A protein has these predicted regions:
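Transmembrane signal-anchor/signal-peptide helices with a preference for the extracytoplasmic
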Residues: 61-82, 237
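A generic, lipid-embedded transmembrane alpha helix
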Residues: 49-66
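Short extracytoplasmic/periplasmic juxtamembrane "stem" segments immediately C-terminal to an N-terminal membrane anchor
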Residues: 80-97, 247-261
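Structured inter-helical modules in multipass membrane proteins
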Residues: 90-182
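Alpha-helical transmembrane anchor segments
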Residues: 6-26, 30-36, 179-264
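Short, Lys/Arg-rich, polar N-terminal cytosolic tail immediately upstream
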Residues: 1-4
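Membrane-interface segments at loop-to-transmembrane junctions
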Residues: 40-51
Length: 264
């Protein structure tokens, strides 16, 4: 689906999806009922109603498999952001064991990494433009500064080792969210859902072509199911795009500038 649709608020996305689906169902109803005369009417009625359950099951399976894939990607994106935020928070806390100057330098680099991620990384991920070739320069610099620290005692040596691990964990989580941001429901999958839904709507219209009211009711009910399925998949299809997307709120909570150094 187009970026313009996926970036709409969910309410407007629902309006577009439901309107398009109902328009398609109405078109099928009009075409089939107009064609259902004389020999064609008998041919339409020869279509076995037993076809409808298999078609409905196939549509449900397609939707189910794609929905599971989409929602798994969304959950993985949330976990990646939470892991990155947790690792960066560990760096900030462990930096407190070192002198103020070194602590402030590391905190400033962590803040800069988060600000770049929020202000540049998230918009780029929403457009699926951020790639692994974009290096986290602030995080790399924080790792270099951490490795250059001269521990004065065992506690600082342990803190330095844990900080290195936390920075590596943050970098790995960043890579994960970038990879996940590239995920999307492919054109073939969208085409499969739409074609399966179209075939089912046509079959419903043909089976009920001799009773226009029953035909209209059946088409409306199934079209509603199609629209709802498409809406749910579209709303979650890109983890970092649209109104329902993974936000950088957890990362923002790690920013140290302007925050008290300890709990009240």
């Amino acid at each position: 689906m187009g970026d313009w649709l996926l970036n709409l608020p969910v309410l407007w996305m629902a309006v577009v999806v439901f309107a398009a689906t109902y328009l398609l169902a109405a078109s099928i109803y009009w075409i089939v009922t107009r064609l259902a005369v004389n020999d064609r009417a008998r041919a339409f009625k020869s279509v076995s109603p037993g076809m409808l359950p298999p078609l409905g099951i196939l549509f449900a399976l397609l939707v189910g498999f794609i929905a599971v894939e989409v929602w798994n990607s969304y959950e993985k994106a949330k976990v990646a952001v939470a892991t990155e935020a947790s690792a960066l928070r560990s760096v900030v806390l462990l930096a407190g064991t070192f002198p103020e100057e070194q602590k402030a330098r590391i905190n400033a680099l962590v803040d800069r990494h988060i600000e770049v991620a929020v202000n540049e990384g998230w918009p780029a991920m929403a457009r699926r433009k951020l790639t692994l070739s974009t290096l986290p320069t602030s995080l790399i610099e924080a790792l270099r500064v951490t490795l250059e620290l001269k521990p004065a005692d065992d506690s600082q040596r342990i803190a330095q080792s844990e900080m290195v691990k936390a920075i590596h964990a943050a970098a790995d989580a960043r890579r994960q969210r970038i990879v996940i941001s590239q995920s999307a429901v492919g054109t073939v999958k969208w085409a499969g859902i739409l074609l399966m839904g179209l075939c089912t709507l046509v079959a419903i219209a043909m089976v009920h072509s001799d009773n226009r009211l029953a035909c209209a009711i059946a088409l409306t009910l199934f079209a509603t199911g199609i629209a709802l399925s498409l809406l749910l998949i579209a709303a979650y299809s890109r983890p970092f795009t649209g109104e329902i997307s993974v936000r950088p709120d957890l990362l923002k909570q790690v920013i140290t500038s302007g925050q008290p150094s300890s709990n009240p």
